[in-house]
Amino acid sequence: MSPRVLGALVAALTLAADQANKLWLIFVYGIEQRQPIALAPFLDVVYAKNPGISYSLLSARTDFQRYALLGLTLAATIFMILWLWRSTSKLIACALGLIIGGALGNAYDRAAYGFVADFYHFHVGSFSWYVFNLADAAIVAGVALLLYDSLFSARGAGTGGKSRGEGASAL
């Protein structure tokens, strides 16, 4: 399977899993009326409406702000799609697929509902992490894979900093 096809498949599966999870929790399970649900001593399922991005940064309270944030998300997604199209590395294709699928999942929420639905809340004692969704987890995993590739991929002499998987010579 080519990196392009692999990345597109990962993006589609990520988007589908994210949207299915959100729709099931909201409309089938009814999380809004049943929260919080303790999955583990450190993990709850809750329902949070996030008008911004991670940590509610760039909170979009007006229609203009929401559409500006949506436009920024779509521009970044287009950049990632172009990067995926040029990728020759399956690792990078998977990473970009995770980021693209997650970004599209959250962009859909923002366009359709005016906010992103978040559900998962990690906490230990008084420490509390932000509430996130599968799309956010996919984006973080994709960025982690890109970081892994940039730190640990074999580098060839004269590659201009490119990993072998991205068109660099193995010599």
From Swiss-Prot:
EC identifiers of the protein: 3.4.23.36
Taxonomic superkingdom: Bacteria
Gene from which the chain derives: lspA
Function: This protein specifically catalyzes the removal of signal peptides from prolipoproteins.
Location in or out of the cell: Cell inner membrane
Record-level GO cellular component terms: plasma membrane
Full protein name: Lipoprotein signal peptidase
Residues forming the catalytic site: D118, D136
Keywords for the protein's UniProt record, in alphabetical order: Aspartyl protease, Cell inner membrane, Cell membrane, Hydrolase, Membrane, Protease, Transmembrane, Transmembrane helix
